A protein has these predicted regions:
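Bacterial N-terminal signal peptides
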Residues: 1-8
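Juxtamembrane interface at the cytosolic side of transmembrane helices
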Residues: 194-206
Length: 206
């Protein structure tokens, strides 16, 4: 996924306070799907609270199952819709720091999500993303990434005051018409020649 932002928000990811849970979302739109990167960084004052959400058996380690469970918990708090129609996002991958890194306020949970889009006509479309995960003492950032496909052009981004909601206006261009393959053209030429021979009137011998 490209990491180039269409526009950058005013707050750097590393500038969050110790008593905040920074949630930074980056969204990439392709013609047939949307990909989301979500970085979750708790400050020192919130570290134990977030760790308790992840480390459900309280053994001090973050097991693969606990990581997946927390990823699903975050996913349940996110919504994505295209032109008002909800689309289902799925957790593609998750990266978790160690518990000690989180306690020091240096650990970032990185989630990658993907959602298939319905067949869309060319023209203007609107994708809306909402994040309702852990609203207490969280700070949200949301930005669109520069599309990888030249068929997609982001034209505007609209956020609510807290950046829990981002609407991306974009234009989708029609897929280019591909010329027929050379072998297909050759086959058509041969078929045309054979057809011409088949319909040629036979001459009688005198």
């Amino acid at each position: 996924m490209s990491v180039t932002l269409v526009t950058a928000s005013g707050m750097g990811v590393s500038a969050h306070r110790v008593d905040e849970y920074l949630q930074a979302a980056r969204i990439a739109i392709d013609p047939d799907r949307v990909q989301l990167e979500l970085d979750l960084t708790p400050g020192i004052a919130l570290a134990e609270t977030i760790l308790a959400d992840i480390d459900r058996d309280h053994d001090g380690s973050l097991s693969s199952e606990e990581q997946r469970a927390y990823g699903r918990l975050v996913l349940d708090a996110l919504t994505v819709d295209i032109d008002g129609t909800p689309v289902r996002a799925e957790l593609a991958s998750a990266g978790f720091p160690g518990a000690d890194e989180i306690r020091r306020g240096e650990g970032t949970v990185r989630l990658q999500l993907t959602a298939a889009l319905p067949g869309l006509s060319s023209g203007v479309h609107h994708l809306r993303f909402r994040n309702r995960h852990h609203p207490d003492r969280s700070v949200y950032l949301a930005n669109a990434l520069v599309p990888a496909s030249d068929r997609v052009s982001v034209t505007a981004q609209r956020r609510d005051a807290n950046q829990t909601e981002l609407t991306i206006d974009y234009t989708l261009r029609a897929a280019p018409v591909r010329p027929p393959a050379a072998w297909l053209l050759g086959g058509l030429v041969a078929a045309t020649a054979l057809s011409a021979l088949a319909i040629r009137p036979l001459r009688s011998f005198r």
